[in-house]
Swiss-Prot record:
Keywords: Cell cycle, Cell division, Cytoplasm, Septation
Name of this protein: Cell division protein SepF
Organism: Synechococcus sp. (strain CC9605)
Pfam entry (one): SepF
Quaternary state and interactors: Homodimer. Interacts with FtsZ.
Length: 188
């Protein structure tokens, strides 16, 4: 008795040695016969040409294919919210979870409640790997990860123009002109 036979005898018991387990019929033999019959009828090329490579078995009852949540052919949706209290903030989080962009106009709220609301929605946005951007005074944009937010005019808008009332007309023109670029200031 070989080593492998001994291991089989120990693991499977004596039934394996009697050959009773070899009597089971397997479906593999039937599949091999069907494959040979198809090749004999038209060859391998005929079976490939007759089948539709894009047929995913849609005619099968009870298909297990489930669409991905949030992926649709519909246009992107933007929710503009003007909350009056912090109690309305969960609606903003729910909209973000539904992959909708949210613009919060917090001018109607008290400053401390507005700060709390921004912190709450910013935390929810961070949790879903989203983006946040300040659009204006007390106006914020929150977007899910499927939306790309770019800000091209932020540097130009952040440089305020300062004009003093006591300055003469020549100084006003100097202050009112566009600021010089940062890379040119070092050369002066």
């Amino acid at each position: 008795m070989s080593l492998i036979s001994r291991l089989r005898a120990v693991v499977a018991g004596d039934d394996y040695l009697d050959g009773e387990l070899d009597d089971f019929a397997y479906d593999d033999e039937q599949d091999d016969q069907d494959q040979r019959a198809l090749q004999a009828d038209g060859g391998a090329l005929a079976t490939i040409g007759d089948s539709n490579p894009f047929d995913l078995g849609g005619d099968l009852p009870g298909s297990n294919v489930i669409g991905m949540p949030g992926i649709s052919n519909a246009a992107a949706e933007v929710n503009v919210m003007e909350p009056r209290s912090f109690d309305e903030m969960p609606r903003a989080i729910q909209a973000l979870r539904e992959r909708k962009t949210v613009i919060l106009n917090l001018t109607m709220m008290e400053p401390d409640q507005a700060q709390r609301a921004v912190d709450f929605v910013a935390g929810g946005t961070f949790a879903i790997d989203g983006h946040q951007e300040r659009v204006g005074e007390s106006i914020f944009l929150f977007a899910p990860s499927c939306v790309t937010v770019t800000n091209t005019g932020h540097d130009e808008a952040s440089a305020p123009t300062v004009v003093s009332r006591e300055a003469d007309a020549a100084d006003v023109d100097e202050y009112a002109s566009a600021p010089s670029p940062a890379w040119g200031a070092a050369a002066l």
